[in-house]
UniProtKB/Swiss-Prot annotation:
The family this protein is said to belong to: Belongs to the ABC transporter superfamily. UvrA family.
Name used for this protein in its record: UvrABC system protein A
Organism for this UniProt entry: Rhizobium meliloti (strain 1021)
Subcellular location: Cytoplasm
Function: The UvrABC repair system catalyzes the recognition and processing of DNA lesions. UvrA is an ATPase and a DNA-binding protein. A damage recognition complex composed of 2 UvrA and 2 UvrB subunits scans DNA for abnormalities. When the presence of a lesion has been verified by UvrB, the UvrA molecules dissociate.
Key word DNA-binding present: yes
Lineage: Bacteria, Pseudomonadati, Pseudomonadota, Alphaproteobacteria, Hyphomicrobiales
Length: 973
């Protein structure tokens, strides 16, 4: 039977798909595009991937199936030509603090193996290598000293420890030993002077005295074995006739000698041990380098690399406040007089008053309040009618909170104290997560923690030249390991992630970054004959890096895989072998194949909206004139230097639309989100989060609100929906409660809530579905047979408005809801804003966990639009065009520019040139990602930025503005 050339889909009806019939070529790069909500993901993920995965899992045994997530069978008549499917979605890789870029890509596993096999342990005390040897190797080494050499074979019994050691010396005499070397002097055991137990001593047992000759191998082996047994794996050969040079017997001399030693000596160890400090390393195995294994993890932080510590900046968030006005945050809300009376007593000693600002207090006073006093202080307390004095030391706020946090069993109390804590690098391992023994093992002067800290670009360069610094034997052992590491680093580099470090926590990655990491891992696995389904891999990627990403996708195809990509990026669509355009609109108005074929077929199809944008027939317009920033109305960040920012000072003009641009890893998010947003939220909104390191920020007096509209879910449960989030559900319930039928029955608005008892169906508790666990199959959600999925009981559903119950209203699309509630402004106005941001196709009661990141972001935007504008709000959006088609981008820009027209300020982090070209002002970071970035390369209008030769954004923007003549305008003015 010949291999099928196509993936044949018949009757796909999942979600909004309208019985799609489609034949997709196998082993090709296929792009699915179309408006947001048109059904692309329903076809690619919920139909094609789900069926491919389901069939593969179904072919496994029942025992294996219980460990794998089983997909629901999609609503489709037939699919032929499927391969086992792998999906790579936008989800952040892992929130587990133990998951890093290195562990996800398996590079860290190879690093552990490399360090275990070719790493050399070094002594932290001397900086010299530590080696382990067999008895035979030790004998051979002694014989190399030369014939006639006189040696003492010593067993180092005590190394730098206090004590008298009378019992130990008596025990040695019983065993037949006669001489010892104590603190550098030889004695007969019976003549050893009494040792002062207050001082540290060194004691070596003289096991043998030998003169090196070729025939003493057997005697030497016996002596060395005795030494190793006595001294727990250590033996010393000391030259009797070779004193150390005078300069090495002075303080700070040789690393090979202990206190008062005056003769040259060689230490042998059957373990890895330091001759000076006695620092030993257990057997060097890969698990020693794992921070997820007790064998290697730092015992202080359990391998996390950081510890929660009380943060002084959170205890005193506003140093210019007075003590009476609540400068000390943990005490600010208390109504008890105790805290003020405590401060008054401290003030008497350290010279301050309750009316003093924290910043005016002396360092000594601040230290006493935060960390306590050594000397006793008399405190006077008045508690109602009772008055008393007490003399004691003051514990200090920081030690007090730390003690209570450790001692309390109350989750609430711990949470309350954790508000004043932040993560600080572990003091024991300096954030490297590993035990000292693991960090003592080095390759080419670096330990595994230092290699992990490198950026992928730097690590790639380091591993390229590493073989030159290894011995022939080490290279033989490491050749295959190095090949695997270098390949994986190259793949990460190819998908535009060269600025990340291997130690970067997975939970801090953006959706696009984590997706590209998984993509790099897949290329590393080298699978063929697989169906890959990807969701917008270009998210968060600068145009400059797009070509490398597309090369990667083509490589996946060329090794014999079918690659399906849901994508809106113009370059990705034009590079595809086959394009499927889903539409014509979103939601119930979509779900059909509008056009399919090569990119040129799409462009020549008159029905395809995508084709019109690709051909230039439609375009997002450049505004007729740009708003001019007012000189004195701006927020200025001075001296931002967190992560890779190089002491950046930049101003964001207010009352205009600003785009923060630059290559991935250039420092955009650190500057805008970590520094500016967190500082503004703290100052303007009273938030508690700590901003990243900077000197100061000027201009907050011009804004009264700062809002970060991100793509996080609007709710994680099926009970949360667009109506509850935007506040539309409250007036809907109020309206139904005010209807004659509801009044006659005495129903209150709560009756129409599916979250509380009363009006909801109790069989499913207002969920509309009941979960049934199936052990070898996926959990099945069946429609509740009492309310039939309506969520409410029969009595509640008896109340109708225009013939519709509350359940019918929640099942309407936003578009239908606007028409239905045309005469109810309180509801209509909230729904109109959802319609405005292009969400007319979603259902009013659609479960929040079914919304994409882009949809969730636009629901948040709609909520902001529906509020009364003060004209002084700063809106911050991180890549708002994620998941948006060209046409959706045009609509979104209308909304954002409308917010600016109301006097507000909008700042977006964006790579999409269609958005950047409409900005009034651009701040471009770079020039590269990671260590090569962190500077402001250009700032000004788009026309000014294109003139900056170092700006990659400027180069691509110039191309776009020159290349695309606008024939028809669809966008914001």
């Amino acid at each position: 039977m010949s291999e099928l050339k196509t993936i044949s889909i018949r009757g796909a009806r999942e979600h909004n798909l309208k019985g799609i019939d489609l034949d997709l070529p196998r082993n090709k790069l296929i792009v699915m595009t179309g408006l947001s909500g048109s059904g692309k993901s329903s076809l690619a993920f919920d139909t094609i991937y789900a069926e491919g995965q389901r069939r593969y899992v179904e072919s496994l045994s029942a025992y294996a199936r219980q460990f794998l997530e089983m997909m629901q069978k999609p609503d489709v008549d037939q699919i032929d030509g499927l391969s086992p499917a792998i999906s790579i979605e936008q989800k952040t890789t892992s929130r587990n603090p133990r998951s890093t870029v290195g562990t996800v890509t398996e590079i860290y596993d190879y690093l552990r193996l490399l360090f275990a096999r070719v790493g050399v342990p070094y002594s932290p005390a001397t900086g010299l290598p530590i080696e382990s040897q067999t008895v035979s190797q030790m004998v051979d080494r002694v014989l190399e000293f030369g014939e006639g050499t006189r040696l003492y074979m010593l067993a180092p019994l005590v190394r730098g420890r206090k004590g008298e050691y009378r019992k130990e010396l008596a025990e040695l005499m019983k065993k037949g030993f006669q001489r010892v070397k104590v603190d550098g002097q030889f004695y007969e055991i019976a003549d050893v002077p009494a040792l002062d137990k207050k001082y540290k001593h060194d004691i070596d047992v003289v096991v043998d005295r030998v003169v090196v000759r070729p025939d003493i191998g057997t005697r030497l082996a016996d002596s060395i074995e005795t030494c190793l047994t006595l001294a727990d794996g250590l033996a010393i050969a000391e030259f009797a006739d070779r004193p150390l040079p005078p300069e090495e017997t002075s303080a700070g001399g040789s690393a090979n000698k202990s206190l008062n030693e005056t003769h040259e000596r060689v230490l042998f160890s059957e373990k890895f041990a330091c001759p000076v400090s006695g620092f030993t390393i257990p057997e060097i195995e890969p698990r020693l380098f794992s921070f997820n294994n007790p064998f290697g993890a730092c015992t202080t932080c359990d391998g996390l690399g950081s510890q929660q510590k009380i943060d002084e900046a959170l205890i005193v968030p506003e140093p210019n406040r007075t003590l009476r006005d609540g400068a000390i945050a943990p005490w600010a809300k208390s109504t008890s007089p105790y805290y003020n009376q405590t401060l008054e007593a401290l003030g008497t000693v350290f010279g301050f008053k309750l009316g003093s600002r924290w910043s005016e207090l002396s360092e000594e006073a601040q230290e006493a309040i935060l960390h306590g006093t050594k000397d006793k202080i008399t405190f006077h307390y008045q508690d109602g009618a009772r008055s008393y004095n007490t003399t004691k030391t003051f514990e200090g706020i920081v030690p007090n909170l730390e003690r209570r946090w450790k001692e309390t069993d109350s989750a609430w109390a711990r949470e309350e104290i954790e508000r004043y804590m932040s993560a600080a690098p572990c003091p024991a391992c300096a954030g490297y997560r590993l035990k000292p023994e693991a960090l003592a093992v080095k390759i080419h002067a670096l330990h595994i923690g230092e290699v992990s800290e490198m950026s992928i670009r730097a690590a790639r360069d380091w591993f390229e030249v590493l073989p030159e610094h290894l011995s022939t034997k080490q290279n033989e052992i490491a050749v295959r390991i190095l090949k695997e590491i270098r390949e994986r680093l190259r793949f990460l580099n190819d998908v535009g992630l060269e600025y990340l470090s291997l130690s970067r926590n997975s939970g801090t990655l953006s959706g696009g970054e984590s997706q590209r990491i998984r993509l790099a891992s897949q290329i590393g696995s080298g699978l063929t004959g697989v169906l890959y389904v990807l969701d917008e891999p270009s998210i968060g990627l600068h145009q400059r890096d797009n070509a490398r990403l597309l090369d990667t996708l083509r490589h996946l195809r060329d090794i014999g895989n079918t690659v399906i990509v849901v994508e809106h990026d113009e370059d990705a669509i034009l590079t595809a072998d086959y394009v499927v355009d889903i539409g014509p609109a979103a939601g119930i108005h979509g779900g059909e194949v509008i056009a399919e074929g090569t990119p040129s077929d799409i462009m020549s199809n008159p029905k395809s909206l995508t084709g019109k944008y690709l051909s230039g027939e439609l375009s997002v317009a450049v505004p007729g004139e740009r708003r001019k920033p007012k000189k004195k109305k701006e927020v200025t960040v001075v001296g931002a230097r967190a992560n890779n920012l190089k002491n950046v000072t930049a101003s964001i003009p207010l009352g205009v639309f600003t785009a923060v641009t630059g290559v991935s890893g250039g420092g955009k998010s650190t500057f805008l989100i970590e520094t500016l947003y967190k500082a503004a939220a703290r100052r303007v909104m009273g938030a508690r989060e700590n901003p990243a390191e900077h000197d100061r920020i000027d201009g907050f007096e011009h804004i009264d609100k700062v809002i970060d509209i991100d793509q996080s879910p609007i709710g994680r449960t099926p009970r949360s929906n667009p109506a509850t989030y935007t506040g539309a559900f409250t007036p809907i319930r109020d309206w139904f409660a005010g209807l004659p039928e509801a009044k006659a029955r005495g129903y209150q608005p709560g009756r129409f809530s599916f979250n509380v008892k009363g009006g909801r169906c109790e069989a499913c508790q207002g969920d509309g579905v009941i979960k049934i666990e199936m052990h070898f199959l996926p959990d099945v959600y069946v429609t509740c047979d009492v309310c039939h999925g309506k969520r409410y009981n029969r009595e509640t559903l008896d109340v109708h408005f225009k013939g519709k119950s509350i359940a019918d209203v929640l099942d309407m699309t936003v578009e239908e809801g606007v028409e239905f509630f045309a005469a109810v402004p309180a509801v209509r106005d909230k729904l109109v804003t959802l319609n405005q941001v292009g969400l007319g196709y979603i259902k009013i009661g659609q479960q929040a966990n079914t919304l994409s990141g882009g949809e969730a972001q636009r629901v948040k935007l709609a909520k902001e639009l529906s509020k009364r504008s003060t004209g002084r709000t700063l809106y911050i959006l991180d890549e708002p065009t994620t998941g948006l088609h060209f046409h959706d981008v045009a609509k979104l820009l209308e909304v954002l520019h409308e917010l600016v027209n109301q006097g507000n300020s909008v700042v977006v982090i964006e790579h999409n040139l269609e958005v950047i070209k409409t900005a009034d002002w651009i701040i471009d970071f770079g020039p590269e990602g990671g260590d090569g970035g962190g500077e402001v390369i250009a700032q000004g209008t788009p026309e000014e930025v294109v003139k900056e030769p170092r700006s990659y954004t400027g180069q691509f923007l110039k191309e776009l503005l020159e290349r695309r003549p606008v024939k028809k305008v669809v966008a914001a003015e």
